[in-house]
Structures are given as structure tokens and as C-alpha cells.
Amino acid sequence: MSAIFKIIHETSSKFMDSILREGKLLTSNNLNKKFLTDSPKGQGSKDRKLCDSEESIKNKEHFWKHCDEADGVYFRILEMDTPLKTYAGDIILVFSKDMLYKYSWILNTTENFGFYISSPGFEGESQFSGEIGTTYTLDTLKDMDVSSFDPYSSELCVFNNVSLKFLKEIYVREPAFEDLQLSVRALNKYSNAPVIIF
């Protein structure tokens, strides 16, 4: 991923303690096992039917009937100069692109709940939205036309738990900062990421 983009994950102060205890962001399936009654805000729903991301290629015609979301950790891609704002929580975690060389993932140019839109690098139609888009992997990312890429419509789905050692910055809404101060001290064993109030 080019240095002109940042990779972000949104969460809430309520669940930051759990993230710090684990030392990583958990995939949807692992989250559901840990939080049987209450899933972290901004990280999917415990009621979604999870499937392997490649199910959309193996069973293209019918997978959407029994799959709601691919199992993974979800991120948004933003241009570097985009002002940060929260949609589902009060904390934004900014991650290093170095994690893309550590884990298995796909980048969809239009939302498709973490499933492949088509074979990597080839344009196709999102099975959920009907929008035209392309799925990229590490091997095909070099072929992406960045000039026509709209990061705000895209989704990045990582198929592994993601270590906090790849964390670069933490942005916290001011009302949540007081509650978070003690928790963030625990972050030092994973990362030296600065905490920024916004």
C-alpha cells in the first residue's frame, strides 16, 4: 500500500481494554468466541454468518445465501490528508503498511463484506451491492491504478489476528480519553504508538 494512504481500524473505549489484553485485533470468528454476548462496536456483529473469503469464488452463484461476512479483521483506507472522524466508536487505530507483508489479506475497491469480488486483479460485480470493483492481493496490488482508486469506497480484510506491534498511532475522542489513560499504559509492551486527542 502506497505511503499516500493510511490504514485505520475503528473501535470504542469500552473494548480497548480487551484489545490491549489480547495484544492484537481479533478476527470476527475469534471475537465471537471471546465476546459471546457483546461484540466490540465497529468490528462486525456476532449475529453475522461467517465464511471463508474464498467461498465467493468456490460457490459464486449461491454463497451469499449462507454467508454474511468473511472472517477477518476489517480496516478502512484513507488518504493521508483526510481528517479523521469516527463512525462506530470513539477510537481510531492507525496501522503500519508493514502488516501487509506479514498477513494474508484482500483489498476490495468496493465493499463486499470481505469476500473476493472476482479473481484478484480482475474487475467484477460485488455480489452484495451490485457495484463494479476489483479485488487486490499483495501479488496484484502493483497493478492497481491509484489515480482511479477511491479509498472511501474500499475495504481491507485481513484474514489473521493483527498484532498491536504494527500500531502507529491512536486517535481518541476527548470524552473517552479519561477512561482510557490507564489502559493505554499497557500498550507500551506492544507498541510506542502515540495517543492523540481529536
Curated annotation (Swiss-Prot):
Annotated InterPro entries: DUF5863 (IPR043846)
Taxonomic superkingdom: Viruses
Protein's name in the database: Uncharacterized protein 422L
Organism (species): Invertebrate iridescent virus 6 (IIV-6)
